[in-house]
């Protein structure tokens, strides 16, 4: 029974066998044309190569720069902290434990004010925005830098 199962007609394409005589349609040069770099074994050009003319990516001007002094923070918005209980001490370890952040970046955690905070929370984080500080103080919370 199982040995008789076959795929539907047209479901499996027959592989094109190369270099098997002129009658096959892909004999002799096997679809690679006559001589040249592309006909050789392992031959070909690198991505972006345009035959010797200045490539497109070199013709367009450079833009921007990479700031080596950039500080990277794990961002937490106030709206994401609604799941916490009142009077909780919010620090990096708690945020990781509750899966509010995936990882702690080199400079720690920064609190931003997106979303609404209704619970009184105490924060001990690396950095915070002015607006976040205002919203935390408004609901009776406390924030300090560790």
UniProtKB/Swiss-Prot annotation:
Alphabetically ordered keywords of this record: Ribonucleoprotein, Ribosomal protein, RNA-binding, rRNA-binding
Record-linked Pfam families: Ribosomal_L27A
Example GO molecular function: rRNA binding
Region (Disordered): 1-46
Record InterPro entries: Ribosomal_uL15 (IPR030878), Ribosomal_uL15/eL18 (IPR021131), Ribosomal_uL15/eL18_sf (IPR036227), Ribosomal_uL15_bac-type (IPR005749)
Entry's Gene Ontology cellular component terms: cytosolic large ribosomal subunit
UniProt-listed GO biological process terms: translation
Biased composition (Basic residues): 9-19
Comp. bias intervals (Gly residues): 20-30
Family designation: Belongs to the universal ribosomal protein uL15 family.
PANTHER family: 50S RIBOSOMAL PROTEIN L15, LARGE RIBOSOMAL SUBUNIT PROTEIN UL15M
Subunit-structure text: Part of the 50S ribosomal subunit.
Function: Binds to the 23S rRNA.
Entry-linked HAMAP family: Ribosomal_uL15
Protein's name in the database: Large ribosomal subunit protein uL15
Origin species: Phytoplasma mali (strain AT)
The gene coding this protein: rplO
């Amino acid at each position: 029974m199982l040995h008789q199962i076959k795929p539907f007609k047209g479901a499996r394409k027959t592989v094109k066998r190369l270099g098997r005589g002129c009658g096959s349609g892909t004999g002799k040069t096997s679809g690679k044309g006559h001589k040249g770099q592309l006909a050789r074994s392992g031959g070909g050009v690198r991505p972006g190569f345009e035959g010797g003319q200045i490539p497109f990516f070199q013709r367009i001007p450079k833009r921007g720069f990479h700031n080596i002094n950039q500080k990277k923070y794990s961002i937490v918005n106030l709206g994401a902290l609604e799941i916490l209980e009142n009077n909780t001490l919010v620090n990096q370890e708690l945020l990781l434990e509750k899966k509010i952040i995936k990882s702690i970046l080199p400079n720690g955690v920064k609190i931003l004010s997106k979303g609404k905070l209704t619970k009184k929370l105490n924060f001990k984080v690396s950095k915070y925005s002015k607006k976040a500080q205002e919203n935390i103080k408004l609901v009776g919370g406390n924030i300090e830098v560790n």
